[in-house]
Amino acid sequence: MEKKMNTDLFYLTLKQKRYKRKKNIPLRIRLDKNDLSANTASIKFTDKPYLVANKIIKSLEFNATSLYRCIKKNKLRSENFSVQLSRRLLRTKKTLVLPSHVNITLISNSYDVIHSWFIPALGIKIDCVPGRATHHTFYCDSVGFYYGQCAEICGRYHHHMPIKLCILPFEHFLIWWQHFGLPKLLFTESKNRFETDYGLKKFCW
């Protein structure tokens, strides 16, 4: 029993740059007429097995379902590509760990210039002013990672300052606390000792 397939003629042109020449993607189309499945046409590309930018496809005769699936996969890949590039802007050397379902009072201070500790998901924006301590109390009921950044034009060589916050359940936080311990909050005048003792490095991983 043979299953007939309706073939249509498609002309598809992708956006390309001017300094790139248009070239055809060589492909071979093999029709499996004895196959009763939905995919009766299998396409074999000699180039990369997905639609590539700066290329042109024209005069293709095959099932419309396979063309739609190919375009759909390429669309999802292009949408996720910007997300993958933006992940590097969220990377931090240290991650601040805090417990959930607890009222947390955050006291901030700055050593050199004015900063702004800003996490949009938690609704927190604290200005860190040198010589002045600012505080803010917040409550977090959702466990997970929260990302933020410094929302202040600090000055020269002060840019791209991301923040990564990890909220753990209270029971897990107690285990983590017992393993790593709390930081030593020492008010010192030395910048090196200030960064090592007061910089909450032991409170992060």
From Swiss-Prot:
Positions with a binding annotation for Cu cation A1: H115, C150, C154, M161
GO MF terms held by the record: copper ion binding; cytochrome-c oxidase activity
Entry-linked PROSITE patterns: COX2, COX2_CUA
Binding site for Mg(2+): E152
Key word Membrane present: yes
Ranges that cross the membrane: none
Cofactor requirements of the protein: Cu cation
Catalysed reactions, as listed in the record: 4 Fe(II)-[cytochrome c] + O2 + 8 H(+)(in) = 4 Fe(III)-[cytochrome c] + 2 H2O + 4 H(+)(out)
InterPro entries associated with the record: CcO_II, CcO_II-like_C, Copper_CuA, Cupredoxin
An example Gene Ontology CC term for this record: mitochondrial inner membrane
KW Transport (keyword) present: yes
Keywords, ordered alphabetically: Copper, Electron transport, Magnesium, Membrane, Metal-binding, Mitochondrion, Mitochondrion inner membrane, Respiratory chain, Translocase, Transport
EC number of this enzyme: 7.1.1.9
Cellular compartment(s): Mitochondrion inner membrane
Positions annotated to bind Cu cation A2: C150, E152, C154, H158
PANTHER family for the chain: CYTOCHROME C OXIDASE SUBUNIT 2, CYTOCHROME C OXIDASE, SUBUNIT II
Subunit structure: Component of the cytochrome c oxidase (complex IV, CIV), a multisubunit enzyme composed of a catalytic core of 3 subunits and several supernumerary subunits. The complex exists as a monomer or a dimer and forms supercomplexes (SCs) in the inner mitochondrial membrane with ubiquinol-cytochrome c oxidoreductase (cytochrome b-c1 complex, complex III, CIII).
Known role: Component of the cytochrome c oxidase, the last enzyme in the mitochondrial electron transport chain which drives oxidative phosphorylation. The respiratory chain contains 3 multisubunit complexes succinate dehydrogenase (complex II, CII), ubiquinol-cytochrome c oxidoreductase (cytochrome b-c1 complex, complex III, CIII) and cytochrome c oxidase (complex IV, CIV), that cooperate to transfer electrons derived from NADH and succinate to molecular oxygen, creating an electrochemical gradient over the inner membrane that drives transmembrane transport and the ATP synthase.
Similarity comment: Belongs to the cytochrome c oxidase subunit 2 family.
Protein name: Cytochrome c oxidase subunit 2
